[in-house]
Amino acid sequence: MDQARPSRRAAFVAAGGVFAAGLALAGCGGKPEQKSPGGEVSAVEDLMREHGVLRRILIVYRETAGWLAAGRTDFDAAALGQAADLFRAFGEDYHERELEEQHVFPQLQKAGGPVAAVVPVLLAQHARGRQATAFVRARCASGRIAPADAPALGKVLQDFARMYEAHTAFEDTVAFQAWRQSMSDKERETAGDQFEKVERSHFAGGGFEMAAGQVAQIEQKLGLADLARYTAGAVPAP
């Protein structure tokens, strides 16, 4: 049995848990998080801005998946491989394994409730994402994409982006908020300190700044850096 694929029952439970968690948080009267002294980044803000970097990689994946679907393989495959390398190092080995899986998820499971019931689904999605990352890295290792590989690679990129967009949206709006509300002010401060230590041990400095800089370079190489290119086209008159 594929351990990375949630069962239908798990998916049903997850769907109910997402809805119930949203209701629970909407009615929760927990204290609002105080700003860190000196303008320091809180643990939740740190997690969410890291998601911002990862979402920029998802944009790269969606755009290149569209090119592949159109039969185009003449773009910089090495840059796509670098995006997957960055997702592995920053998203999976650091953000997921060291922060979410070591700190956030155990606290959610300890607190119990509907959000805790969704943790197995989040973990399964982490595992599936690592499979996707390995596939992308392998297909881009030579610096070019073989035309025969284009359909499968495009599907993996598209499916991964779809999954991770839902995954990060749930974490940002439900899981991280439940995690924050499950802790005292002192525990939140301690979590922020722990996250900073983990970041320094991994990157010897600002991991977020490093990752944001790298994804900007990847966007430039692929011609995806201009924000205006994503502006929606003209909307027909109603």
Go through the PLM ranges and name each one.
Residues M1-P238:
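Small-residue-biased structural context
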